[in-house]
């Protein structure tokens, strides 16, 4: 309510980040991890708004830049699958764009969320010893690394999917990006299984959405996205995460 019904996606984004940052780390010193969180939220504030102000081709390059930075800042520890939170947040904010006063409220909500995430992250990770620093995230970028090739692959696949959707004049291009992101895994052998589950549970999710749409009063429609976000955050397996997405 503080940020308005148009910004319910901010609550989803912050909630997912909190759920991840309770346990996940960035593979660098904890205090430097706070810089990563600041960078991530800075991208979430500026990137989606900027890409929506541009035509499809320039927006593609903005998306490439922002998603690549999110990968570098938040996904150094591949096993944590942090991209499924931070890139997802970027895509949701990009798809549910706002302007004017609503955007100012969005910025305030994301800044408040950033502070909450920093506090939780520092409290839970402050005693973990790490040798890597914030700058090492950039120094260690090397295209001969499987991790960094995955960064590039996911960035261009997601951005290209949204570009194609935009050029075709189709709404909510971010859904194509989310679909591609969810099956573009760091371990290639896992991709096929993900693709099969996504098809089936997309149908399940659609049926759940229809049920909620029919059952809930119209005043609750803006919060269906938040309900889905909570479902994603508490789903242990990919199949049900897909359904709630």
Language-model features: locations:
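Alpha-helical transmembrane segments and their membrane-interface boundaries
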Residues: 1-231, 235-245
